[in-house]
Amino acid sequence: MSSTSLLLSSTKPVIYQTAKKNALQLISSFSKGSVNKSTHYPLLTKKSIVDGMKDSINNRGRFLGQGKSSLCGPASFFFTLLKIRPDIYVQLIIDIYSNGKTTLKDLKLESSQSAKNLKPVSLREVDWLLLSSIKPKYDHPDEQFDGITLPGKLKKWFIDAGFTDVVDNTNLISNKGLETLLKAQNDYSSGYTICLFVDADIFYPFKYKSGSSFFPNHWVVMNSDVKIRKYNEKTKKHKPASIITQPIISSIKKQISDIETAAFLDDEDDVSTETYDRILLDAFTWGKQSVPVTSKISSTQEARLSYFLNGFYGYIKVKR
């Protein structure tokens, strides 16, 4: 039985600080150990792996990133693991670097031979080693299509890894609405990790934004509550941000109905874009722990709720 299997076999809950302490001890032992160079990853240095693990543990995943690859699904999976069990995250990396492969319960992790012989440019060596290991047919960061992760695959990874409460609430064809967004918030408040399935445009910096959303192409992990700033018709200003609730949704739906009626009557004054509600939401993505939803309207403007919903295709919730 591997060290990773032993870590997973315990049924007692592990406190994060204890897991972090164990992770740092594992890193220290590995750095002083006899393995100085991996025969499986000849171009990845032990120092880069050790430094990468330390950065991820001490910053709780801040630097765990996909670079220019399409490995957002694997990044979301391993970020979820890292933030609750950093000791398991570290043990996986050590096992893969030392032995070329490992298992996490029923999840087999081994990179393709081409991936093992590659020195990545657009992402850290430790991230390439780990993220490519869950995609056995993935050879290079530039291979965008092979790096794509569909909801069913991400769900299976979590189940195979031992997460016992995994629910898929996504849609590949049409975007989701307010009710699904409220469910995501409620699940987040209940302690679930929420992997949002979105059009990446809603998290892109303003200068890289495109137009309308036609399909989901990105996974991110929620790192904040979903908050809404309602527009006050009387004061002509937005109200303070509040966590999304059913009453807020009911108010928004009424507002949408009123706007649609005004549009039908060609009353331009009543369909002013300034009445659009705003959404505030941060998520882990692209190696950064907290990236906010931003609008395509202005680089300094909070994102319109309607803009976010246009690129929101649901979520997967997980809990160990």
Regions found by a protein language model. Give the residues of each.
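Core alpha/beta structural scaffold of self-assembling particle/tube/pore-forming proteins
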Residues: V121-L182
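Noncatalytic regulatory segments and standalone regulatory/sensor domains
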Residues: K227-R320
